UniProtKB/Swiss-Prot annotation:
Stretches with biased composition (Basic residues): 112-128
Organism: Porcine parvovirus (strain NADL-2)
Compartments (UniProt record): Virion; Host nucleus
Stated name of the protein: Capsid protein VP1
Function field: Capsid protein self-assembles to form an icosahedral capsid with a T=1 symmetry, about 22 nm in diameter, and consisting of 60 copies of two size variants of the capsid proteins, VP1 and VP2, which differ by the presence of an N-terminal extension in the minor protein VP1. The capsid encapsulates the genomic ssDNA. Capsid proteins are responsible for the attachment to host cell receptors. This attachment induces virion internalization predominantly through clathrin-dependent endocytosis.
Entry-linked InterPro entries: Capsid/spike_ssDNA_virus (IPR016184), Parvovirus_coat (IPR001403), Phospholipase_A2-like (IPR013607), VP1/VP2 (IPR036952)
Comment on protein domains: The N-terminus of VP1 is sequestered within the mature capsid. It contains a phospholipase A2-like region and putative nuclear localization signals.
UniProt GO cellular component terms: host cell; host cell nucleus; T=1 icosahedral viral capsid
Entry similarity comment: Belongs to the parvoviridae capsid protein family.
């Protein structure tokens, strides 16, 4: 009997059965996950060949799937295969999705109602031939920082949430740093690159998990900077030596730069009110996954004025002027999130927006000298001095990060940044200490219907259990609880540092009674037209106060301290009431200074505030880290996404003086398109209660807040994100 024919092993890598060309499809069980991905890849190629397609010279959906499945491979074969097909993706023409043997196996992707049912997602038409030619030329020249598969090249890019796996990484990746970026030409003037996309896509992954992919696009207008220099500027309320302003003190020192900051770190940049309603009503937990952004379709223009009266402005395209782009991937520069100043990109995709000027604090010494004794008539004086020479930190973008020079038609992509943050709950907690654990046993229950007929309890000195007061009275007020939900914190306290006085931040929690906003950290928002104000006039501002839904706050007007040992007299003897002064000061009461934070404190995270709230924040570089940040619910455990800076390069004239800090310049401005993708994972709400719950909705009276007026005015109201209740215990 002849021996059985040997299976073709082809050129498989050592230790693998399928990873390599020329092998048969019946080699047995794969040796590891990368080998399993290779087996599935070979089977897909076999289907292509049987259907008359040649997958070896085209980039196919099977190649894309293999890239995704080996993205985090630890074995050498998986890494080799991953980067081989990424290189193929950059240069090979692509098969259309209709040629994919796995098209019918893609999971359902539900999109927000904003997506037109008849529209096609980007990435369907063949890539222009010049894309591959330009990339090949740049590859030959050794431009190592070229991003070979940027977002704007999604004329052939698959939908990023196809298949129930992680989003495919395009361009340079970051595993927790600031992300890598690169600029390149995109075919020159007149070649359209990229798409304008503001959809929010929801992919249901099963087992209650959802991937939310938020796309944002804006047209950004950028004027050339007023100056090309860095300026250290002191700011004072008034001249030094006159009356100080105390709580209205503004004195500081800042470094003003010629650069602008593109900041998309606000909820309103990524979601519209309908998206937020869907998320807050249906999700109980959300977490950040990844972030990427891109600049494309750069247009640079110059302005000249005629000598006529009145002068006539003439606008011309400038094909040689440059837009400077810098990405601080390693967070070298001072971190300056723009949301607390309401200076992020605008919230309305149909309106052009602009970046904010980049500036940062410098060390300074601020002194407020009050009178030395009560009744002294001397004014409070103020002064400001340059910080100690050992504390000065002067940064310039030009020597801190690489700078890319873009001309008309060029583009820049940051690559993908991956977050490392804790999940955020989108529910509120109603339970306080008085509602934790087992309630007391009733002595009698009511027999008549109606809340006005209560039950009764046994006498306080006959109840069983334990508490922390050394007497025989066991009441709901003295019952011991497992932990402390929330805490009392000093409020309206101004600590003092070298830089001057500052209001001690407290965790925002909703008040329990009497609308005590300040003791519970309510946040006051002030915004302009780009960020939610109704009016079309840029001179007006709108304000609102935001109280989160969490019930972990305190009612300072009803707090009291009792003497020890506990005295049960019915008078106020031994009881310190909120109205009782401390140290003879009629305006100082104990709830202003009492801090009950300790090892037993249980606390909820900072609530997200749509649309004006900041999304993520940078972790402080201290040995002892704060548990929460007031400004943002997500705190990046590693470096946050790198800050993106832009600046129009100096467009000089022939009148140049090397001894002058300011040179004559041709008036130049730029319009360019920015877009980004921010990805979340979320958990869907499950219904375990009998009663229905309150959800975010609108009424006939306030629906007008979400639609424009007859002259285009529109408003973005704050929307609560934690309406769904949850129990703590």
């Amino acid at each position: 009997m002849a021996p059985p024919a040997k299976r073709a092993r082809g050129l498989t890598l050592p230790g693998y059965k399928y990873l390599g060309p020329g092998n048969s499809l019946d080699q047995g069980e794969p040796t590891n996950p990368s080998d399993a991905a290779a087996k599935e890849h070979d089977e897909a190629y076999d289907k292509y060949i049987k259907s008359g397609k040649n997958p070896y010279f085209y980039f196919s959906a099977a190649d894309e799937k293999f890239i995704k499945e080996t993205e985090h491979a630890k074995d050498y074969g998986g890494k080799i295969g991953h980067y081989f097909f990424r290189a193929k993706r950059a240069f090979a023409p692509k098969l259309s999705e209709t040629d994919s043997p796995t098209t019918s196996q893609q999971p359902e992707v539900r999109r927000s109602p904003r997506k037109h049912p008849g529209s096609k997602p980007p990435g369907k038409r063949p890539a222009p031939r010049h894309i591959f030619i330009n990339l090949a030329k740049k590859k030959a020249k050794g431009t190592s920082n070229t991003n070979s598969n940027s977002m704007s090249e999604n004329v052939e890019q698959h939908n990023p949430i196809n298949a129930g796996t992680e989003l495919s990484a395009t361009g340079n990746e970051s595993g927790g740093g600031g992300g890598g970026g690169g600029g390149r030409g995109a075919g020159g003037v007149g070649v359209s690159t990229g798409t304008f996309n503001n959809q929010t896509e929801f992919q249901y992954l099963g087992e209650g998990l959802v991937r939310i992919t938020a796309h944002a696009s804006r047209l950004i207008h950028l004027n050339m900077p007023e100056h090309e220099t860095y300026k250290r500027i002191h700011v004072l309320n008034s001249e030094s030596g006159v009356a100080g302003q105390m709580v209205q003190d503004d004195a500081h020192t800042q470094m003003v730069t010629p650069w602008s900051l593109i900041d998309a770190n606000a909820w309103g940049v990524w979601f519209n009110p309908a998206d937020w309603q869907l998320i807050s009503n249906n999700m109980t937990e959300i977490n950040l996954v990844s972030f990427e952004q891109e600049i494309f379709n750069v247009v640079l223009k110059t302005i000249t004025e005629s000598a006529t009266s009145p002068p006539t402005k003439i606008y011309n395209n400038d094909l040689t002027a440059s837009l400077m782009v810098a990405l601080d991937t390693n967070n070298t520069l001072p971190y300056t999130p723009a949301a607390p100043r309401s200076e992020t990109l605008g919230f309305y995709p149909w309106l052009p927006t602009k970046p904010t000027q980049y500036r940062y604090y410098l060390s300074c010494i601020r002194n407020l000298n009050p009178p030395t004794y009560t009744g002294q008539s001397q004014q409070i004086t103020d002064s400001i001095q340059t910080g100690l020479h050992s504390d000065i930190m002067f940064y310039t973008i030009e020597n801190a990060v690489p700078i890319h020079l873009l001309r008309t038609g060029d583009e820049f992509s940051t690559g993908i940044y991956h977050f490392d943050t804790k999940p955020l709950k989108l529910t509120h907690s109603w339970q306080t200490n008085r509602s934790l654990g087992l309630p007391p046993k009733l002595l009698t229950e009511p027999t008549t219907e109606g809340d006005q007929h209560p039950g009764t309890l046994p006498a306080a000195n006959t109840r069983k259990g334990y508490h922390q007061t050394i007497n025989n009275s066991y009441t709901e007020a003295t019952a011991i609880r497992p932990a402390q939900v929330g805490y009392n914190t000093p409020y309206m306290n101004f600590e003092y540092s070298n830089g001057g006085p500052f209001l001690t931040p407290i965790v925002p929690t909703a008040d329990t009674q009497y609308n005590d906003d300040e003791p519970n950290g309510a946040i006051r928002f002030t915004m302009d037209y780009q960020h939610g104000h109704l009016t079309t006039s840029s001179q007006e501002l709108e304000r609102y106060t935001f109280n989160p839904q969490s019930k972990c706050g305190r009612a300072p007007k009803q707090q009291f301290n009792q003497q020890a040992p506990l005295n049960l007299e019915n008078t106020n003897n031994g009881t310190l009431l909120p109205s009782d002064p401390i140290g003879g000061k009629s305006n100082m009461h104990f709830m202003n200074t009492l801090n009950t934070y300790g090892p037993l404190t249980a606390l909820n995270n900072t609530a997200p505030v749509f649309p004006n709230g900041q999304i993520w924040d940078k972790e402080l570089d201290t040995d002892l880290k704060p548990r929460l940040h007031v400004t943002a619910p997500f705190v990046c455990k590693n470096n946050p996404p790198g800050q993106l800076f832009v600046k129009i390069a100096p467009n000089l004239t022939d009148d140049f003086n090397a001894d002058s800090p300011q040179q004559p310049r041709i008036i130049t401005y730029s319009n360019f398109w920015w877009k980004g993708t921010l990805t979340f994972t979320a958990k869907m709400r499950s219904s375990n209660m009998w009663n229905p719950i309150q959800q975010h909705t609108t009424t006939a009276e306030n629906i007008g807040n979400y639609i424009p007026t007859n002259i285009g005015g529109i408003r973005m109201f704050p929307e609560y994100s934690q309406l769904i209740p949850r129990k703590l215990y």
